[in-house]
Each structure stands twice: as C-alpha cells, then as structure tokens.
C-alpha cells in the first residue's frame, strides 16, 4: 500500500492490530481494546498529561520533567516515587532492546538485572513487563506519566502503554527513525507511526485525550531550528490526521539566548499556521524545551551552570515544559540523587524567571522571521514533492536531500547539510546540501559565518564544526581556536 497522509479506517487498523499484538506474548493482554478504554477512564484528572499541559499554558508556567527508566518494575516505581516529589511530569524511558523490538534480549536483560540486583538495561522494558505490571506503576504514582523512547516501530509499545494508563506518548515516524536507526525506511516508520497515532485517535473518540510529542532535538548536535521545526510540524500534521488532539512540539536548546527564545516562539506560531491552514482547528498545542543535549563537562559545578541556563531560557521563552538534565550527564545514566539535583536546580531557576518572560526585541524578532522563512521554504518544497501529501512528500524530500538532519545515522538521510555557530553562538548553515533555502537566506548564513571566521583568523572549515561540537564540554559555547 502506497504511503499517504490519510486516516486509517477502522477495518485497516483492526486488521493490522491482529498482527501487531502477535509480535510478543504480552500482546494478548490488550486484545480487548475496550478494556484499555475503560481503564483510561478511571485515571483521575490530576494524572492526565494533556490537562497538565493545558493548565500550564493558560497560567504561563513552565513544567519540569526528567528522563528516567530502569529494568525492574519495583525499582522503577521506587525511582519515580522519589522523582515525583521534585518534578511536575514523570517519564518512563524505554530500554534500547525494546526500541528495536528485540524483546527476547530485553527478557535476558530483566533476568540479568534480577541476578545482579541492579538494572542491566538502560530503561524500562514495558512490552516485556506487560499491562498488569505497568498498571501497578501508573496506579502507584501521582503525577502524569509519559512514555519516552526512540522506537521506529512503536506499535506494540503504544498498545501496552495506553492500556496501562500512560497518558502521553513521545516520538514520530521521522524523529524516532532518522536520529536512531540506520536501515529502517521512512515509508515503514511513518506508516507504523500512523498506526500509533490512529490508536491515540481512537482513544480520543472514546473521550480519552492522549498527548503526543514529536521528538524535537533529533540528533541533539548543532541542529538548526528550521530543521527541527519542519520535522515537528510534519509529525504534528500526521498525528492530527489520525485523530490526535493534544500535540506538544519540541526543540533542543542550542545555547544562543536570542536563537533559543526565537525558536520556541516561532515553533508555536508556525505549528498553528500549518495546522490551521491544512484544516485542523480542534486541537491543543504546547511546546517542550529540551535542556542542552550535547556533550557536558565532567565537573558537576559546570554541569549545573548548563542545566540552570537551560531552565532559565525555557522559562523566559514561554515553553510549556522543560526536559531536565543531571550533573552526571558526562558520566552516563544518572542516579536518582543526581536526577533530583538537576530537577531542583531547574525548578529554582524556573521559579525565579516565572514572571520574567523575555521582552520583544529587534534581535529576537529578526531571528523569528528568519526561522519562519526557512521553515516555509522547506515545507513548501516537501508539500510540492508530495503533490500536497505530506507523508509522501516527506519520503521524497529525504530522498532528495530537501529534508536533511545533521549527523544522523539513517541511510535514507543525505547527511550533506553542515551546521556551524556564528560569532554570537547561533547555529548557521555552513553547507546547505540540497536543502532549498532561498539565495538571500543562504547569503545571510554565509555572512554570519564569515564574520566569525574573520574574528578567529581562519577559514570556515569542518574543523570549526568539530570545535563547536566539543565546545560546551570544554566550558565554552563557541569552539574558538
């Protein structure tokens, strides 16, 4: 079947569902869709993700959410019980085997974790644990819960998660393929995520609003805002077509105050612009700001500075929520104590800037207009390639290099675009590849980069890019020689 941005019919969905539920033994727990609906209807309002986001947006507050997940359910429950005292929203980060649908290996990881008395997986294997165990998790905790993962084919995970009482689901057919996988085709991942979104849409039709969040940071490495914005908007459109009504579009901090504030503000405005221009009006929109996703310094004091800076910018830019980091980021998966330190530092800063939204200024306005022009140029070409169909257009756009994510592993990603910082730390385009930015915009990027090159007395080359990638872990933003 040729990929199209068209709502799956009930028969199409149910026929596919029969096969999805057979991919692991716990699929039998969710054969009765109505059972999942009835369980979701028992969840109180204070534990519903979409309501928490809606309330925060109305009140102008920025909510905090960490990342966290371990192999065994009892330990995971204890971890989240500890974290919920310091955050507004809770995660369940999924392990790497589940992300690749390698459930047998996840089962081995559970066994080894039991034997070792500590987690041997980098997340919670929800599919292996099944509905009963996961319902124990959602019933024990008192904050809204979201599944955070990185799964190109997240269909069975979605089924078990929703029937278990999670009320938000991160990811998308682009953002959980291009940065995470090498050999998964976009046709397959987008189609598999149409199933996930249709599942959420079916819950919506039964009065259950599930929040959906495309993954904004992508590779987390020098991502120009227009690239992540374009993909977030595409995934939002794909979700809306399948009946999703609560969308959170995301963005990963780049470190430039002007560009980060402009990015969050333009992301919300552009999402409304495209959603409404394509006929979607009945939806709730929120934004998420991811604290710095690149390399961290090993020194905890320096790490706290990065965490606090991210929280400050998230709050001042008006983001609905911020995904926090820990001072152990350079060392690997953080302990609960380190995670709490990151949450506390973030909350202190969020409280201090709560009434201090970043004021309008010419520099931010110029950056907003630049990002909007770039996104429109890219998305217009994507729609053109697909003859108006955003799903088909996306596949063709990646084939043509029109959509191109820096430093991504996917074979279907051109990898020709090369970003670099300008003299103020904003992310600019050094080499555009086939990304269809207008000449005047490319000239502007060239001028920004040339200004930095003159200041540093060197040519803008790949070495400058490498220096920028390593800069923050070396206590700088710009990779000066």
Swiss-Prot record:
Reaction(s) catalysed (UniProt annotation): (2S,3S)-3-methyl-L-aspartate = L-glutamate
SUPFAM superfamilies: Cobalamin (vitamin B12)-dependent enzymes
Function: Catalyzes the carbon skeleton rearrangement of L-glutamate to L-threo-3-methylaspartate ((2S,3S)-3-methylaspartate).
GO process annotations (BP): anaerobic glutamate catabolic process; glutamate catabolic process via L-citramalate
Cofactor dependence: adenosylcob(III)alamin
Secretion signal span: none
Positions with a binding annotation for adenosylcob(III)alamin: 69, 122, 179, 296, 325, 329, 333
Listed name of the protein: Glutamate mutase epsilon subunit
Annotated keywords: Cobalamin, Cobalt, Isomerase
GO MF assignments: cobalamin binding; methylaspartate mutase activity
UniProt record similarity statement: Belongs to the methylaspartate mutase GlmE subunit family.
Disulfide bonds: none
Pathway(s) per entry: Amino-acid degradation; L-glutamate degradation via mesaconate pathway; acetate and pyruvate from L-glutamate: step 1/4
EC number(s) recorded for this UniProt protein: 5.4.99.1
EC category: isomerase
Cited InterPro entries: Cbl-dep_enz_cat (IPR016176), Glu_mut_E (IPR006396), Glu_mut_E_C_dom_sf (IPR014714)
A Pfam cross-reference name: Met_asp_mut_E
Binding, L-glutamate: 67, 99, 148-149, 170, 176, 180
NCBIfam families reported for this sequence: MthylAspMut_E
Top-level taxonomic group: Bacteria
Subunit-structure text: Heterotetramer composed of 2 epsilon subunits (GlmE) and 2 sigma subunits (GlmS). GlmE exists as a homodimer and GlmS as a monomer.
């Amino acid at each position: 079947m040729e990929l199209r941005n068209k709502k799956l019919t009930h028969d199409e969905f149910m026929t596919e569902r029969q096969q999805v539920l057979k991919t692991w033994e716990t699929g039998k727990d969710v054969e009765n869709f109505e059972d999942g609906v009835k369980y979701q209807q028992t969840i109180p309002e204070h534990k519903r993700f979409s309501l928490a986001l809606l309330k925060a947006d109305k009140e102008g507050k920025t909510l905090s959410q960490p990342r966290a997940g371990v192999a065994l359910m009892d330990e995971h429950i204890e971890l989240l019980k500890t974290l919920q005292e310091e955050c507004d929203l809770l995660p369940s980060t999924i392990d790497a085997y589940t992300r690749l649908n390698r459930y047998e290996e996840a089962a081995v990881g559970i066994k080894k974790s039991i034997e070792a008395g500590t987690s041997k997986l980098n997340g919670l294997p929800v599919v292996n644990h099944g509905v009963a165990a996961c319902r124990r998790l959602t019933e024990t905790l008192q904050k809204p819960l979201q599944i955070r993962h990185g799964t190109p084919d997240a269909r069975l995970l979605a089924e078990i998660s929703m029937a278990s009482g999670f009320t938000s689901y991160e990811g998308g057919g682009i953002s959980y393929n291009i940065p995470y996988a090498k050999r998964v085709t976009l046709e397959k991942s987008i189609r598999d995520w149409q199933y996930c979104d249709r599942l959420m849409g079916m819950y919506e039709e039964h009065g259950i609003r599930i929040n959906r969040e495309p993954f904004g940071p992508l590779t987390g490495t020098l991502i120009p805002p227009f690239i992540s914005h374009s993909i977030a908007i595409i995934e939002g459109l794909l979700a809306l077509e399948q009946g999703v009504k609560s969308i959170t579009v995301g963005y990963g901090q780049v470190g430039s105050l002007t560009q980060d504030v402009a990015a969050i503000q333009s992301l919300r405005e552009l999402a409304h612009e495209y959603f409404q221009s394509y006929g979607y009006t009945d939806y709730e929109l929120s934004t998420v700001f991811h604290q710095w996703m690149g390399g961290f310094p090993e020194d905890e004091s320096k790490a706290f500075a990065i965490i606090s800076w991210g929280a400050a910018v998230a709050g001042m830019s008006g983001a609905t929520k911020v995904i926090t980091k820990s001072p152990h980021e350079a060392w690997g998966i953080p302990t609960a104590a380190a995670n709490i330190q990151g949450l506390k530092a973030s909350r202190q800063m969020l409280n201090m800037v709560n009434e201090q939204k970043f004021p309008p200024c010419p520099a931010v306005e110029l950056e907003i207009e630049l990002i909007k022009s770039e996104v429109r140029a890219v998305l217009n070409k994507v729609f053109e390639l697909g003859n108006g169909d955003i799903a088909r257009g996306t596949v063709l756009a990646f084939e043509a290099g029109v959509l191109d994510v820096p430093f991504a592993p996917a074979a279907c990603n051109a990898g020709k675009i090369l970003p670099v910082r300008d003299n103020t730390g904003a992310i600019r385009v050094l080499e555009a590849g086939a990304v269809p930015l207008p000449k005047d915009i490319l000239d502007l990027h060239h001028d920004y980069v040339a200004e930095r090159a003159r200041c540093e007395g060197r040519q803008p080359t790949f070495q400058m890019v490498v220096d920028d990638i390593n800069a923050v872990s070396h206590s700088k933003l710009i990779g000066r020689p």
